[in-house]
């Protein structure tokens, strides 16, 4: 049963526990040619939750998300786009409908097809993941 739908990435991130996120922070490094996780952690903190949008164009958006143990997102799906992640740090649990819960680690790549509910939790942090999907993707919460 659909309970909520959202395309505003700042609202999505705030509701997922990144309370200090705002548009200025999210877009500060948007479409920068080269970025580095350690540089972001020096600026925003290793032991805090934050997000920055690295890529944004007509075809895809990419958001780097740093979260602490026990943090993650709400169960949701994207009705019109697949979503991909690259794990940069930490240990995560990915629940994917029809596949159950999987543990993922640094250098793992995860793909969830459109329409498939999923839930992400950092279990050993700080954890960093790079999420890639269509720009302004619709999140439908279940």
What are these regions (language model features)?
Residues 47, 63-79, 114:
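Conserved short histidine dyad/triad with adjacent acidic residue
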Residues 98-115:
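Short acidic-glycine-tyrosine-enriched beta hairpin
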Residues 69-71, 80-81, 100, 116-117, ...:
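A generic "binding-loop/recognition-motif" signal
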Residues 2-22, 59-61, 65, 119-142:
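Double-stranded beta-helix
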